[in-house]
Amino acid sequence: MMFLISMMTVLLMIQPLPVQDPRPVILAFGDSLTAGYGVPRGSGYPEQLQRKLDGLGYKYRIVNMGISGDTTSGGRARLQSALNVVPSIVVLELGANDGLRGIPTAQLQANLEEMITAFQKAGVKVILAGMTLPRNYGGAYVQSFEEVFRGLAKKHSLPLIPFFLEGVAGNPKYTLDDFLHPNADGYVLVTNLVLKTLEPILKK
């Protein structure tokens, strides 16, 4: 009996370790727009983008670190966890909730810049997702909000998606009932938009 137990112990010890996925990581880092709020599992843009990349023969693995309701302050607090993933590329999609809450754009800019700088220092290529807001937030605030993304992209030489929800926001064909969050069809448009900016980086 002891011999059998010993043999089983040895066999367990020599079991091969799980093989880690060797593909470089593209990190989808954002809020509900990245998390895939309100759509069936697999319908969000990170999952759709993974299927697109697989079909095109790109050997990358997408990690979804989207959290619904997150702000740039929340993203900054999660920064080390994001770096621990050791991404090669990050799609940084944060700021919409800051704008909807009327957070000062100086704070938005400082938070985004801290994340951008940390990613770049770690050798991560950053794609910045730009945002806009409903005009009832006031023309001056909306203009200042939009300029944060343009300014940071220019300052840090980042590929910029001018408006992450281009063709989606406000269109009931592509959104949930809130006219903001994409539905599954809306995420097809978002995925294509991200891929358009991402693919030139992958081809380098």
Where are these regions (language model features)?
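Serine-esterase "nucleophile elbow" of acetyl-processing enzymes
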Residues: 17-68, 78-86
